[in-house]
Amino acid sequence: MEVGVRILGTFCALLAFCCFVFRDIPVPAPTFALPVSSAPATPPDDKERVRSEIREVEKLLPETPERGAALFFLAELYKHLGEVDKVMVLLEECVALDQGFDPGAVPGFQAFRENARFREMVEQVRRRYRPVQHGHVAFTVADKDLFPEGLAVDPEKRVFYMGSMHRKKILQITASGEVSDFAKAGAYDLMPVGGLRVDPVNHDVWAASDPGVKNRSELLHFDSHGKLLERFPAGGAGPHDLNDLVVRGAEEVYTTDTDGNAVLRLDRKSHRFTQVRFPRPIFYPNGIALSGDAKLLYVSDILGVMAVDLLTHEAWDVVPDPHDTLAGIDGLYWYRGDLVGVQYGTAAFRVMRWHLASEGRRVESSEILERGSDLVKSPTTGAIFEGSFYFMANTGIENLRDDTILDESKLEPVRIAVVPLK
């Protein structure tokens, strides 16, 4: 869910994100040169769900430290209701905050390209945020139809693990790029494999899976040789989509439930899920990370990053740099007191590093590691290994819909890129 500043380059990838967030809402066919005056209003079937989200987000506006993210999200919601004037006002205020949000990269906004106000906003963002490239391709996985979502690394074994949404399996990749199956397709009746993490103590591998055709989203626990040891369906009233996860010691696993708008804690002894509480509603949570001492849990959603102290249960919004945002992070990782992530929330995909203050409650400064290059064509997650951040550059997820490949001519080997963390 994740690429540069070119409108056509971002269209397909962001269409996948919009279809994910509004997966129960029909998305109109794209129109790249339709004047705003003739743009059809295509209200979703579920108007009330969208209006309910609007009410919740508007309540947060007076106090949220992520005002730009809230405005950008509201603009997308109002676009789905066909309220064009409201969209323009929200986008103008958002862009004026200079936090990197790029309206021109949102598929739903392409109908506005002939609107002078919209064009000026896009040009302003493009002048301000130029391409940044610090990375290069580390190795390539030859299979073209994997559509990977999750990447993890075992630094001691020097092995990467990559999950396949389409093949429904997990690969292992050596640091030199040699590829083999870790959990074979068909072996355990897996659904599309999402986030992955390695237990640093025993080298076991944990995975989260999408609901798939059997509507069975679950956490999966493999031993270090690829044998499935345990599986934990989300259960309870849905919908559920367990997206990413972190392993905290031998007793608990935390996972983001994107469709359920929740973060869940799995008690490994009782095998029960409980919901983590936050001070505000959470919208489509995705990336998740633990601090180095495992006391703080960081969770990304469409409005930013929230943190929770796992000892006191106090939770808060992490305050971003005034001219930056923490909104919409797919892969989120802790590194030497900082957060590193693959970000889609600004609409133009980028790899970021956020330098946190010592208490972990606010960002002191941020650094764009990759933006607007072929290395962020359709990125999702990554892994930190030997002082560098490895991430999947071209997952192709925008070319997969309901487990069907939309255009086989666009299939290509998966490139794993790397950028140094100074």
What do the PLM-derived regions correspond to, one by one?
Residues 43-55:
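Helix-turn-helix repeat elements of alpha-solenoid scaffolds
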Residues 127-147, 365-366:
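A short helix->beta-strand "capping" segment at the edge of beta-propeller domains
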Residues 217-225, 353-355, 406-422:
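Beta-propeller blade signature
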